Amino acid sequence: MSGIDQKRIRNFCIIAHIDHGKSTLADRIIEKTGLLTSREMSSQVLDNMDLERERGITIKAQTVRTVYKAKDGEEYIFNLIDTPGHVDFNYEVSRSLAACEGAILVVDAAQGIEAQTLANVYLALDHNLDVFPVINKIDLPSADPQRVIAEIEDVIGIEAQDAPLISAKNGINIEEVLEQIVSKIPAPKGDKNAPLQALIFDSIYDSYKGVIIFCRVMEGTVKKGTTLKMMATGATADVVELGIFGPGQFIPAEELSAGMVGYITASLKNVKDTRVGDTVTDAENPCKTPLPGYKKVNPMVYCGMYPADGAKYPDLRDALEKLQLNDASLQFEPETSIALGFGFRCGFLGLLHLEIIQERLEREYNLDLVTTAPSVIYKVYKTNGEMLEITNPSNLPDPSEIEHMEEPMVKAEIMVTTEFVGAIMTLCQERRGIYLGMEYMESTRALLRYELPLNEIIYDFFDALKSRSRGYASFDYEMKGYVPSELVKLDILINKEEVDALSFIVHGESAYERGRRMCEKLKDEIPRHLFEIPIQAAVGSKVIARETVKAMRKDVLAKCYGGDISRKRKLLEKQKEGKKRMRQIGNVEIPQKAFMSVLKLDED
């Protein structure tokens, strides 16, 4: 291990839009370098969560080390760091890129460049990585490699004439990619004898070993027994074991030196101590400065999670704690709701992150959950000069105490075929978007730039974008900052009682429309009772929309055959009195489906 020549190490990652074949290319590289035989291969080797395979996305960054015998007769060590491609995990991507010297840009020969590709390429170029393109899926009937090559050169401005034309699925031209990794990606620099400086690009929790740190050693050497110090969190621990990555397994080694990628286990019990992007150094001989680029990741989207069965509250807490061991960006704190009982207010990086956590809780821990509408962090400035950060609409102060409110904005890039430009611009306008500009990529596609409120895109913007563009639009965003906005709290009252779990903060202009649609939706979902149930949407004390669930009633006139009208009226009045009394003391059963349906207002 210690005799590894730095010049023969290649640290690289693969960047691509969802579905352009990133994980498949990683599979082929692993297979071609003989790390796994074709019998041992399973598709998407590096995506080892069931959820990752099903959705076809990479959630956790994975790493694998393989040895390649090149045509020049030398053996090269490849460290492939597989990165998540989704915008929610942008910070994880940037840290994984910082651990590499180069990147392979995979572009689909049929679809060309997409918004996510652009975002990740710019991220790679910001980290001064050497990027070389690979055109994938050339076996498709609709493939047009020459058009895609021209597009890469025009839009990104990197040389693409000698880009390998491959089919990762069928294993065509993979050798050429391996040779280009050797020739185009530089070897790592770094002095083995300098003080230790290593970058954490991921960490996982193992129930036997504790926290396992995935790191790239930039300077110096780390051995067993070294006392490590995390520069951002200040945590210290002794190295118990270290080594390199095989597919799905850890291979222990004697030491890790400058340029190498590997894992370290130390006697750490909490992933929060080993934050992604932090610098690891030797506690006795520390490096002078930490590596640049570390930032604490803050959740963007919050929502309430409640067990459908109140007795499962401790199980939900245990499950969230276990997930948090592996995912430092997940935050949660206990909260109570009058309608839903005990639960947690959870913070996520974005909507995909929320969906994944929810699905994992339901699958891996067999929990039945009710989630409230997602919310972002609003800044509320009070008349007494105090500033509050609000994630839960129930915590909003009285309107008389609020001077003004601010909401987060994002800068969005939407890639769309020209025939749908009008439809997408209308969608952005509906969502209070501010138009920034538009560029035509070639005659058939355009890149739209908009500033949008985060509040408007966390609900169902992505679904609406896909449906209005028949699945052709792709979308990427980054945070812009806060702007003042006319926001109000929309309350839902069922049978004259406020249901806190259905309240949310909305822009004043869209309050009426949203309230009306929510009332209509709830009317369909709440079953009829023996008394009539008013469903109202209110802003402050003003009711802005109302629907009524009609009462089920017994036919009290069935036993009157003919007879005087006053007799019938007496029976009807008696029934009416009974219903009125019932409405005052009756409880309304709100099914779980009603809470879920409110989240999906735009799917009608």
Curated annotation (Swiss-Prot):
Superkingdom as given in the UniProt entry: Bacteria
Any one Gene Ontology cellular component term annotated for this protein: plasma membrane
Enzyme Commission number: 3.6.5.n1
Record's keyword annotation contains GTP-binding: yes
Principal place of residence: membrane
A Pfam entry, by short name: EFG_C
GO MF annotation, one: GTPase activity
Sites where the protein binds GTP: D19, H20, G21, K22, S23, T24, N136, K137, I138, D139
Coiled coil: none
Reactions it catalyzes: GTP + H2O = GDP + phosphate + H(+)
InterPro entries the record matches: EF-4, EFG_III/V, EFG_V-like, EFTu-like_2, G_TR_CS, LepA_C_sf, LepA_CTD, LepA_IV
Classification via SUPFAM superfamilies: EF-G C-terminal domain-like, P-loop containing nucleoside triphosphate hydrolases, Translation proteins
Alphabetical UniProt keywords: Cell membrane, GTP-binding, Hydrolase, Membrane, Nucleotide-binding, Protein biosynthesis
Subcellular location: Cell membrane
Membrane topology annotation: Peripheral membrane protein
Gene3D superfamilies in alphabetical order: 3.30.70.240, Elongation factor 4, C-terminal domain, Elongation Factor G (Translational Gtpase), domain 3, P-loop containing nucleotide triphosphate hydrolases, Translation factors
Domain tr-type G span(s) in chain numbering: 7-189
GO terms under biological process: positive regulation of translation
Function: Required for accurate and efficient protein synthesis under certain stress conditions. May act as a fidelity factor of the translation reaction, by catalyzing a one-codon backward translocation of tRNAs on improperly translocated ribosomes. Back-translocation proceeds from a post-translocation (POST) complex to a pre-translocation (PRE) complex, thus giving elongation factor G a second chance to translocate the tRNAs correctly. Binds to ribosomes in a GTP-dependent manner.
Homology family: Belongs to the TRAFAC class translation factor GTPase superfamily. Classic translation factor GTPase family. LepA subfamily.
Protein name: Elongation factor 4
Taxonomic source organism: Lachnoclostridium phytofermentans (strain ATCC 700394 / DSM 18823 / ISDg) (Clostridium phytofermentans)
The organism's taxonomic lineage, starting at the top: Bacteria, Bacillati, Bacillota, Clostridia, Lachnospirales
Gene from which this protein is expressed: lepA
